[in-house]
Amino acid sequence: MQAIRNQLLIVFVLSLTLVGCFSGNSAENSLAGLNSNNIKRLVNLYFTYQQQNNWEGPEDEEAFKAFIREYSPRKLERIGIDPAKTDELFVNERDGEPFQIRYGVKGSMMGCSKPVVFESVGIDGKKMIGFLDNSEREVGQSEFDDLWQGGADGEEAARDRDNS
C-alpha cells in the first residue's frame, strides 16, 4: 500500500511540474501563433497602424515602413521581427517574392475582414491573402483579382465562394 502511495505522489508531482513548464509562456505562445509568418505580422502591423491613425491604412509603402521602423523594437521582437531587418518582413517566406499590399484601406473600431496583404506569385497557381481579421486564405487568380481590386472583403468573398 505504501508503494502505491509513493507512486501516486511521484505521478502527482511530475504532473504539476509538467503543467508548470507548459503554462508559463501561454501569452507569449499565443502572440507567436498570431504572428507565425510575414503575412500575419504585416496584417497585425497594418491593423496597429490603423488603430493609431483614425482607422486609416498607411497611404503607401514608405509610410508603412516608416511606421514599422519607429515602432517599439521590443514589441517587434515579441512578434518575431528583428528590428534591424524590417525590410525582410515585406518578403514572403513561401515564394521568396515581395508582397503586394493594399494601401489606404479603411478599417473599423468594430473590426473588419478586408484583405490587405497578398502574395505576388504564390505556389501552384494559388496565392495566400492576409485579412484584417487576422485570417489568411489561399485563393485562385480570379478571387485574388477580385480581392485585390477591393471588390469584396473576406466575408463577402467567402459567402460568394460558398454559394457558387
At which residue positions do the language-model features occur?
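Conserved hydrophobic/amphipathic alpha-helical signal-anchor segments
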Residues: 21-93, 100-104, 108-109, 135-163
